[in-house]
Amino acid sequence: MYIGQLLKGIYKKKGKGQLSVSDKIDRIVTNRFLALPIFAVVMFLVYALSMGSSIADGGISIGTFLTDWANDVLGGAWLTDGSRAILESWGAAPWLVGLISDGIFAGVGAVLGFVPQMLVLFLMLCLLEDCGYMARIAFIMDRIFRRFGLSGKSFIPMLVGTGCGIPGVMASRTIENERDRRMTVMTTTFIPCGAKMPIIGLIAGALFGGSTWVATSAYFIGIAAIVISGIMLKKTKMFAGDPAPFVMELPAYHVPAWGNVLRGTWERGWSFIKRAGTVIVISSIVIWFLTSFGSVNGKFGMVDDLYEDDSVVTDEYVAVVAERMGIPEDEVEPMDDSILARVAQPVSTIFKPLGFGDWKPTAATVTGLVAKEEVVANFGIMYNFDARAEQAVDEETGELLFDENGEPIMEELEENGDQIWENVAADFDAFSGGHGKLAAYSFMIFNLLCAPCFAAIGAIKREMNSRKWTWFAIGYQCGFAYVISLIVWQLGRLFTGGMNVIGLILALVMLALICWQLFKPYKEAQKLSVS
């Protein structure tokens, strides 16, 4: 009574019906029925602005518009063509011109060309994080995860991993349950990190004309892979058990602090650019050497020079190379005899059931283990050598043009712009039997879900603190990526035509095994929860 008298006139009880602005917004964005559709729409808009159709083509993507400029002007006219012109004017040796222009600048330029898209994407994600929306997504995902025996704590490393997989893996330390922590370490890198964005941008841009749904689907495929893997792993003895409790405070919605947003965007973008200036430069030099040198008919040297010697490259030898590569004789190129082609061609057989069993995407995939940026850098180097110049045609008569010596006049191609990515698309279409888009999508899925770069693998080893668990994680990631890509390619061909019966049966068996693991009873977890 005495306390009540003291509080009277000082304390005013808030009415039950009064809701804050954040509460009113949360009634919609965290609604059990509307939360996921709203999240899907938000992410679609994020990727539409960063990786969709360019504003120059009637779309809304600022990132793609800037990336097109970067590829054509920065990568092509300035870095590759500019450096070549300067070096040739100085009288530099051809091999040095090739190393710097076709190797270093072509590889680094191909990667840096996608920086504008990444910066726009990081800016959008930082805005969502700073305004308080992404915290709600963690709350929503916890509600969904818990239904499948997973913890919402696993979603936090996933959010961190959108910038880089290494801090994402390290963020799993906040999970107390050892089994949940190990499972999170294994699956966090499924989410597309900054280094994987150029791969998404390449496939969405080169094969799908800047399609927004391709880029958006890559993000949700990563989330789906985490959820599906979590459910399957939770039903094994190694990971069974009740999920760790997840408690977090939801901040009130607020206007983003631009200082924080720009700082976060810059930090993520700068870490990517630094890698391009270190790891990518070194890797580009190695890839240039492997694609430039090789053994041609028993002679070792630069393959371009050796192929100009008719005494070395005879018709019989071209027939042998064509048979080895599985291509027509008129499509044989100097690079088919390079060291990289010789090594990657046998390995490419492994990826034939996935739709991209050619040595070039195989080489790009394998080098992607060093750094995921290397996938695009590798394409930039290989297709910079492989620019298909066509014979010039008289615009009035339509006749082929020749010079005074009777040699065909070839049209000039952009060395590191749209032409390279058009050649990538043409090759995917060729080696997949006319199913280039499906093969490229399968290629993208595999490279998004397979083992991460060496640096992230090192982080996994530190967090696992076990060589056995590290190899298990790498094996699971590569195996899961292979199976999903196999299913996508084989079932996709069922609808696009030209299906392979054996491949289709194998894909259906894999799909059935995944469904069985997903829906089988959760016995081990029930035992643990009762005890």
List PLM regions with ranges.
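Extended, low-charge hydrophobic alpha-helical regions
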Residues: 56-94, 98-103, 148, 169-181, ...
